[in-house]
């Protein structure tokens, strides 16, 4: 069994990766990426807002924990731990955190704007 404090080119440990504050009550951790796909962990405090935005990337999201009001293309749904959703390219979307929680986002292609310069 390997300790949790290790990383490699193909594996990462959340103990070694930095959290980036991206808004009030909102932070993200880029877990890994290549030229085609990116895995991102997003932590929300209750009341935090992922403001409505759009991008040309495909996005699939898994709700690890918490409760969220998610809006995609004008349609709102309440989602909780264990739920997931897909956002097609250029679809307006956003979320309001109703109970503190975490999302796992997968983007294709890579969100270059998330990478440190």
PLM regions: where:
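Ligand-binding loop in jelly-roll beta-barrel domains
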Residues: 89-113
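Short, conserved beta-strand element in jelly-roll/cupin
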Residues: 43-44, 54-70
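Structural motif
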Residues: 60, 67-69, 76, 92, ...
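Short acidic-glycine-tyrosine-enriched beta hairpin
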Residues: 74-89
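A cytosolic small-molecule/anion-sensing beta-strand core signal
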Residues: 64-65, 80, 99
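Single conserved hydrophobic/aromatic residue that forms the stacking wall/gate
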Residues: 1-10
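A short glycine-rich, His/Asp/Glu-containing loop-to-beta-strand
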Residues: 17-48, 106
